[in-house]
């Protein structure tokens, strides 16, 4: 403890509050913060405070000033504050991405200044390497083909809530997710049978796609987990760090899968709702 650390590197720093970073920063002679302040900031439990609702609270315990201080310490992304204030010589934007196909990049590039000033493909052959190659059919109809890499599915049914829960779920979306999982599994198994996806346990080769389901609400993730219980998807990757994951946006940040299904959940009956955390562009960006 008496000796400082020459270089401290802190990864996934966007979800770290000022207090989270304080100790490692104090120990480092040189500190390198790595993260994306356009993704989710630290989580904040007193959600009812976000709308400024202080009615009925004992001001000796919680005041607006104290709440603002708490927010600054625990909820705000300290990395974002630093990045926007430090001189240009102390910051760098890594604008080449190697994770996804350009079709997907064009969508989230809206959060990074648009296609002209945002992220770019890291390798010329990247689009070829990111081809999913799947032809997914549901009820005999092709709904996913190898030429396209991002799809939007319109669900008309309304959201609902379980008794006593403040979370939301959308049963139609859950059904669509299950149909898609089954369709992707069938398509992958077909490619395996044709030798286009290699699986060889003895040689430790597993080219099956990894799949993830991300939900904006915990109850929706729970509903989909319940529906897929007992179902084995043999067309999906079985590697320990690539197995099928069904989770919320907040829990998934920092992880990745070859194929992602997103359940937005919200579709209120009166077309009016207060969904502050869904409106956060950082959550959609993740």
For the regions a language model picked out, list residue spans one by one.
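Conserved helicase motor core of SF1/SF2 NTP-dependent helicases
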Residues: 2-286
């Amino acid at each position: 403890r008496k000796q400082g650390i020459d270089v401290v590197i802190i990864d996934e720093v966007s979800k770290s509050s000022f207090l989270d970073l304080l100790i490692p920063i104090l120990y480092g002679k040189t500190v390198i913060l790595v993260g994306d302040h356009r993704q989710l900031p630290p989580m904040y439990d007193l959600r009812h405070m976000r709308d400024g609702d202080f009615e009925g609270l004992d001001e000796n315990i919680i005041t607006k000033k104290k709440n603002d201080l708490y927010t600054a310490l625990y909820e705000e992304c300290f990395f974002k504050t630093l990045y926007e204030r430090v001189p240009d010589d102390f910051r760098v934007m890594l604008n080449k991405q190697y994770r996804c196909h350009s079709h997907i990049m064009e969508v989230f590039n809206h959060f990074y200044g648009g296609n002209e000033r945002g992220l770019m493909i890291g390798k010329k052959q990247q689009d070829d390497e990111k081809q999913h190659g799947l032809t997914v059919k549901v009820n005999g109809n092709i709904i996913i083909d190898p030429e396209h890499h991002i799809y939007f599915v319109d669900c008309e049914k309304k959201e609902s809530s379980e008794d006593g829960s403040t979370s939301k779920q959308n049963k139609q979306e859950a059904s669509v997710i299950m149909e898609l999982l089954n369709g992707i599994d069938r398509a992958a198994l077909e490619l395996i049978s044709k030798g286009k996806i290699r699986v060889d346990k003895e040689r430790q080769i597993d080219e099956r796609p990894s799949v993830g389901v991300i939900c904006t609400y915990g109850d929706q993730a729970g509903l989909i987990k319940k529906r897929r219980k007992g179902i084995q998807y043999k067309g999906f990757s079985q590697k320990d760090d690539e197995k099928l994951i069904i989770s919320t946006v907040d829990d998934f940040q920092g992880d990745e899968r070859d194929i992602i299904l997103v359940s937005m959940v919200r579709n209120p009956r009166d077309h009016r709702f207060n969904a502050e955390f869904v409106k956060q562009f950082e959550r959609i960006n993740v």
